[in-house]
Amino acid sequence: MKIRCLKSDLVKGVSIVSKAVPTKTTMPILECILIDATTDIIKLTANDMELGIETVIRGQIDEKGMIALDARIFSDIVRKLPDNEIVIESGVNLQTLITCEKAKFNISGKSGEDFSYLPYIERENPVSISQFTLKEVIRQTIFSIADNDSNKLMTGELFDMNGDILKVVSLDGHRISIRKIELKESYEPKKIVVPGK
């Protein structure tokens, strides 16, 4: 695999997916970020088996392939590189060379085939809501989610949709936050708990 991209694009992508890298795990592959350049796009993926994040970054693919790199090491290297084009190249022995101007880093990777992929989600009956409104609703309710894992449902927010009303609810056992908004369209009743992480 050999790809080229700007530092700014790579840093942005790495910071997005890093939120799904677990701090403690018994599976070392989950401590990695998957760089997937097997198609015509460059995808970065992280997955802790509860939360998975995938993002696409701009760049050029010189040679297709995929590699999983330790998230902490990769993130530290990328952030310290000069603001220029970064070349990431991995060989058959999974050694990965990261170059930018005169800086060169050689790190060991893991096979991308061993990475746990995100499940494919069928997009049926999507809901339209403005980004601003969604951010505001989350900001106004996220503070009251539970921060311990004693009850998994309380570590997320309930999105309860009924007709043209969306109700977002979070609670931690001591306090509760409820926010109702009116949607532009009417939808079938649905309830889903979205992890607060």
Stretch-by-stretch model annotation:
Residues M1-K197:
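Structural preference for solvent-exposed beta-strand-turn elements
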